[in-house]
Amino acid sequence: MMANPPTLPISDHSGGGSQSQQPVSTPAFRTFLSRLSSSIRQSLSQRRPWLELVDRSAISRPESLTDAYSRIRRNLPYFKVNYVTIVSLVLALSLLSHPFSLLVLLCLFCAWIFLYLFRPSDQPLVVLGRTFSDRETLGVLVILTIVVVFLTSVGSLLTSALMIGFGIVCLHGAFRVPEDLFLDDQEPANTGLLSFLSGAATSAAVAAASTPASGRV
């Protein structure tokens, strides 16, 4: 009786290939987190001293609406990082006081990150046995975002928090006398989060160019 020929490990190679393709998005996600962290640190390093922000000797009532508007225009570029921090804190406190809204936003953010932005283009999204194309995935995420932001309490919470933050910024900018303020020497145009956004856009373009022809349409 002839011996059976050895079985070629075809399934093992294909399984290993699929496993090697799964972490394709890991370097891109790590690069995104690294650029985000460095941009936040760079932006925070440009903030003004908080004691200067709350200096009572520099607080006075504006003489007119024109004077208040002029003060706001001069204070905004000078305290921009501090103002963004204040608005972010107001937004964070509002979300922490509403845990359900915070959970909904986190789920929505994770859906965008892991189902579309950093999902490998050669791995289609399969839910309940149905394969979704990239256009269908994008459409579902956009509709879900619209529903969450405009048809739930999340949208009103974000709007009210942002309005409170902007109100604090405008109130401080109108009452802070800017005569003793001066901007640093010509700063680069793209710094901090702006440079991060431009860099992220460039990275996304490079990643899209490097994907195979069978990737996203």
Curated annotation (Swiss-Prot):
Self-association and partners: Interacts with PRA1B1, PRA1B2, PRA1B4, PRA1B5, PRA1B6 and PRA1E.
Query: Its principal location?
Result: membrane
Protein name as it appears in the record: PRA1 family protein B3
Entry annotated with the keyword rRNA-binding: no
Which is a GO BP term held by this UniProt record? Answer: vesicle-mediated transport
In residue numbers, the region (Disordered) covers: 1-24
**Which tissues and organs express this gene's product?**
Expressed in hypocotyls and shoot apex.
Q: Which family does it belong to?
A: Belongs to the PRA1 family.
Q: Does the keyword Acyltransferase apply?
A: no
| A single GO cellular-component term on record | endoplasmic reticulum
- Identify the keywords attached in UniProt to this record, alphabetized: Endosome, Membrane, Transmembrane, Transmembrane helix, Transport
Described function: May be involved in both secretory and endocytic intracellular trafficking in the endosomal/prevacuolar compartments.
The UniProt transmembrane annotation reads 76-96, 98-118, 138-158, 162-182, 193-213
Bilayer disposition of the protein: Multi-pass membrane protein
Q: Where in the cell is it found?
A: Endosome membrane
Top-level taxon of the source organism: Eukaryota
